[in-house]
Amino acid sequence: MKKTMFAVAMTCAAMPAFADEPDGLILPKGFHAKVVADNLGPIRHMALRGHDIYVSTRHGAKDPSVGIIALRLAPDHTVLQKANFGVGTADQGTGIKVWNGSLYAASGTAIHRFALDDMLVPTKSDVIVEGLTQSNHPIAFDGKGNLYVSIDGGGGANNCPDPKTPKDAKPVGLNPCPLLAVRGGIWRFDENKVGQKFTDGEHFATGIRNSSALDWRLGDGLYLINHGRDGTAKGWPELVSQAEDDAIPDEMFRIVKDTNMGWPYTYWDGVRKIRLSAPEYGGDGKTPVTDAKYVKPAAVFHQMRPATLDLVFYNGAQFPRSYRGGAFVAMHGGNDPAIVPGGRKGYNVMFVPFKGGKAGTPVAFAEGFAGPTPEHKNIKQATYRPVGVAVGPDGALYVADSNKGRIWRISYTGKP
């Protein structure tokens, strides 16, 4: 009976709403969206405290830094006050979270902590960790005094290239890969200790290709979503078909000490549902990797290049029970400008249900961000691209867009 109820709840969650939503968003029945902020520029992740929203930003090389954007909302969820702080220091890092009365925010090379009080803009700050390898640095906390910082493998590189490889030859990966000493993993730090160096951190997990999505699931553990490799069919058409390349998924992993997610030596085959050796390391596109040190994904996103850029577990009480403990995922959408029938994948918000501590199959939660037609799901035509998700104190879900800097608040008004 419980299994049936769970299936029905998740099926209902994928049904479109009857009421018109702003920007043509398509939501499950009983859910409604409201635009709470707009024209914020190239924003990334969000952190919420009461009626305040703190937003991390990314800007181009020729654009001025805007640091962290702070918004104070009125009871009707309209902006009362807007300010900026951390300009030139706490930006370009993506990760941002409110934790134990403070705001933690990543820059490209450090983690900053701002003391929060009744004022919107904090006046006191510390550097918790500095000297990090340049990266996005999503962050998470375990409730036991530990701060987790993710550092990707290097801009989504498929391998750890051997510089001695001739330019006209196929890429060859270094083994062992020296990059794994300083990136492609998760490092653990003391959340309260000021002035830590990168070298003070504990190398907690390894094997990340590219990731901006990291969060702690209450009563469970740390989870990360990794971007699957691309361009494999183009480089090795004799080993991997384009269909097999397109089926290489983004993967959600449950992280424990010494977890190895496989980069750069291996990748997850979405067709065969097995781990394969990367062609740069002698892989033939079909022989499974049997080494038990590589962990299996907890869930996979079978969408071609969806660009999963944020992850938040739902611990609120506003949404129906079937959502509690599950994960909302911001799918930014692939960067390939080519228009394909039916549009590119991503450009939406997905939901990963959990039952008995196990992740289920991801389902679409919010659609329509790119525009009214499937062809809008393209980097050149998309109106909006989800880049961040966060849960407010009242249990509403907030979604951030990187194209125009818009933020929606999604609430539930249906039956419990």
Segments (PLM) and residue ranges:
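Beta-propeller domain segments
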Residues: D20-I26, G153-T199, T206-N210, L214-H376, ...
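Beta-rich, blade/repeat-based domains predominating
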Residues: N39-H51, V87-S102, A106, G131-L147, ...
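Residue position within the beta-strands of beta-propeller blades
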Residues: Y54-S56, A105, Y148-S150, Y223-N226, ...
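Beta-propeller domains
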Residues: Y54-V79, D117, G357
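Short loop/turn segments immediately following the C-termini of beta-strands
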Residues: R58-G60, G108-A110, L116, D152-G154, ...
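A short loop-to-beta-strand structural motif that recurs across blades of beta-propeller domains
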Residues: V66-I69, A110-H112, G185-W187, E251, ...
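Asp-box/WD-like beta-propeller blade repeats and closely related beta-sheet repeat scaffolds
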Residues: Q81, V87, Q92, K97, ...
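Blade-level signature of beta-propeller repeat domains, shared across WD40, Kelch, NHL, RCC1
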Residues: A390-P416
